[in-house]
Amino acid sequence: VMGGAQLAGVISIVGRAAAEARGQAFDAEADAGMRAMIEGQIEALSRDDGVTAFGFASPDIQKTFRTPEQFMRMVRSSFKPVYRPRSYSFEAPLLVEGPPTQPVRFIGPDGRGVVALYKMERQDDGSWRIGGVTLHPTGERGI
């Protein structure tokens, strides 16, 4: 029986191989670019800097929420572990189908663990933006 971390590792390896076969090799530069976007948004959220946090979102997300204020209301109400994490750590990016996905483990303000799956979108200028985030409880409890 495979644990969650082992399964994630297998998915990551298979995903990377599939991406390379499609000519979309996932390189260290892309990995660093995605992490920089996510860390930038987490830091902006920690300062309640809605304008900066909103700037890391993809154009489609920006169209959906229209203003930094509306975006921040959504984050505060639905993404508390991301908005006020006790801690977070990056896992290996996943490339299976669709856009690259960056898993990030969070311990939320209530001490509960979640994995946030960040769907990343490459922009015309080569930069990355966050195209969506889903939260998945892990059952972990932080100190």
Question: Over which residues does each language-model region extend?
Answer:
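Bacterial N-terminal signal peptides that target proteins for export
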Residues: 1-8
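Short, low-complexity N-terminal intrinsically disordered segments enriched in polar/charged residues
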Residues: 9-47
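Aromatic-enriched hydrophobic runs in primary sequence
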Residues: 18, 71, 110-114
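Short solvent-exposed beta->alpha transition segments
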Residues: 25-26, 32-36, 40, 50-97
